[in-house]
């Protein structure tokens, strides 16, 4: 078991879901389901196993998981994932015929039946269901609700079920094709969750039976209503409409966004895509950018429709994507979007938790890093990063690691003061100059190593300030990221060269942690500053609203939209005079000219 798996095992949730074991090439070699992901996945790596399982475990280099909201959901998702990926250690399932369906036959008097043979020309099929027990339970309920043929009697001879109101396959009922087609549609609507009409009808019958003292019959109706209520806990991973759709959910935290996409094909959730990246604007804006880039990639098939969360503007997405965009409001479809959001949150939290656990791997990392760079052991490391969007509110940040752990009391933020426009090199020069002039002036402890989040240009700028302006001899390294914002290369030396850094080494984990932390700290500060500047600029020019009162409003309401929604009395409660509060409301609510 490698270190990555050890850490990920500690972070597994106590939730139902599916897990996907992968080999060294990232290929899915086994898909499983679990009532409790933590217990089930851990069991592979502890205790004794049979020969087949030991062979599987020997090939596992990584795993991922998808959280579901029920055990049955996990089972149905497992079916879909196995059929889509055909992992070599799973039982090979050629098609859906291994699973039971409920069928309405195309006979003159249609019947409800359970079958594993799908021939679409001879009936209407619903499913597949995870096992025969689930299919039988649902069919039993359908038999009580819908009067399909339930007997072998000739049409002119009524049966026992006819007297119960559960079989209309008799000439005395005078049914025609339109009647049975309507009944077939009622079943379809019912299984798709549109059961209010039936429940309301049963409720009225129950009340009527109770009023006439027919308590046994009232109890039967009550039991039917309860059975329907149980069925309402439907599976969100299979949809009867058989449509192709992509379902998006996202979650943001600590300057990072995680987007999860569920790929639903022929009504089945068969795959998911996960992407995590730092975001710089409002989350909704960066999500729109992401979804546009997602479908520009030719490998992504454009489905019939795309589901998005409530806070995203559907018209904007439709303009970008070019297909039907849906923001589900309720029911099964809304729950599927919520499931994508939940998995995005879980994935992002796992990323942060793994980074926290990486701190434990710093034993020996500092010494190894010193040996790698041929410098004394870097006990104190100071790292820098710039953050700006098109030159607006440019800032920089410094984080400090002592003995491989963050020393947050030593973190520093910098507003860029001398640079106009987006100029990373000039910004880096200003920040390094300000930091180390203060170190010299105040007699502060200099670092053993400076790490710059950037490439050759930024490192050379920092070196020029440190060596030529201050005459200091502090080693400086650069960390470059790839196009996925992941730690990619370590630059060091004079001239700068790429230092080979094994990705499974302790020193790589330390540098990865430092780079992520300084980036998080910088963009969080940048976002706060932009928000504050935007807030203040829109309050400028309002008579009687000076810096102190703006600060009071910012502290209490957090954002302009909150002020716009606030009542005058709420604003006055913050210590703002009534005349100023009224002027403020009028100014914010006036349409732009």
Swiss-Prot record:
Protein name (Swiss-Prot/TrEMBL): UvrABC system protein C
Domain of life: Bacteria
GIY-YIG domain mapped to chain residues: 14-91
Main location: cytoplasm
GO molecular function annotations of the record: DNA binding; excinuclease ABC activity
NCBIfam families attached to this UniProt entry: uvrC (TIGR00194)
Gene: uvrC
Functional note: The UvrABC repair system catalyzes the recognition and processing of DNA lesions. UvrC both incises the 5' and 3' sides of the lesion. The N-terminal half is responsible for the 3' incision and the C-terminal half is responsible for the 5' incision.
All residue ranges annotated as the UVR domain in the record: 196-231
Species for this entry: Streptococcus agalactiae serotype V (strain ATCC BAA-611 / 2603 V/R)
SUPFAM superfamilies: C-terminal UvrC-binding domain of UvrB, GIY-YIG endonuclease, RuvA domain 2-like
Protein's UniProt keywords contain Iron: no
Pfam families: GIY-YIG, UVR, UvrC_RNaseH, UvrC_RNaseH_dom
Keyword Cytoplasm belongs to the record: yes
GO cellular component: cytoplasm; excinuclease repair complex
GO biological process: nucleotide-excision repair; SOS response
Keywords per UniProt: Cytoplasm, DNA damage, DNA excision, DNA repair, Excision nuclease, SOS response
Annotated compartments: Cytoplasm
